[in-house]
Amino acid sequence: MDNHAAVREFDEERATAAIRELLIAVGEDPDREGLLETPARVARAYKETFAGLHEDPTTVLEKTFSEGHEELVLVREIPIYSMCEHHLVPFFGVAHIGYIPGKSGKVTGLSKLARLADMLAKRPQVQERLTSQIADALVEKLDAQAVAVVIEAEHLCMAMRGIRKPGAVTTTSAVRGGFKNNAASRAEVFSLIRGH
């Protein structure tokens, strides 16, 4: 699984200095009252926003339960927030994550699916990769026989710059195993994701 892990730890001092330089580059005075603490605040915000770079997302799936369950597990409407790696502006929306456990019947806690999505979203990211990384982690760590992940998100890089289309929603999906190979199963899980 390609996790795009960080090559070094977050350097808050360097990030603060870089934000100060950015303010100067756009024509602002970083020493005016309203901006005095902005570089440090932005650096702290980025430290949190990109925290997933410094974590192995598959660790959240290490705790499993042998339930003998061989049917669909689906968590819908998981809020996600990430940063577009092309423009470093947010994209946000919801993830729907479903899987059918492998023959072992091994399942993970429902909150772990949300944690996985959150951890992978907390890095410079593209929606397509995020969707695939979530699906691949479930196959890798749970040995799931079928996985479906759908993300619906609004990208501020499309809303506030360039084409300027606020409200446009991008939908991506990643299917693995039985959902990829069986059209009826895939149609069923997508119907459940849509809430029908």
Curated annotation (Swiss-Prot):
It comes from the Bacteria. It is an enzyme of class 3 (hydrolase). GO terms for molecular function: GTP binding; GTP cyclohydrolase I activity; zinc ion binding. Its EC number is 3.5.4.16. GO terms for biological process: one-carbon metabolic process; tetrahydrobiopterin biosynthetic process; tetrahydrofolate biosynthetic process. The keyword Disulfide bond does not apply. GO terms for cellular component: cytoplasm. Pathway: Cofactor biosynthesis; 7,8-dihydroneopterin triphosphate biosynthesis; 7,8-dihydroneopterin triphosphate from GTP: step 1/1. The keyword Nucleotide-binding applies. Zn(2+) binds at C84, H87, C157. Keywords: GTP-binding, Hydrolase, Metal-binding, Nucleotide-binding, One-carbon metabolism, Zinc. Pfam families: GTP_cyclohydroI (PF01227). It catalyses: GTP + H2O = 7,8-dihydroneopterin 3'-triphosphate + formate + H(+). Signal peptide: none annotated. Belongs to the GTP cyclohydrolase I family. Toroid-shaped homodecamer, composed of two pentamers of five dimers. This is GTP cyclohydrolase 1. The gene is folE.
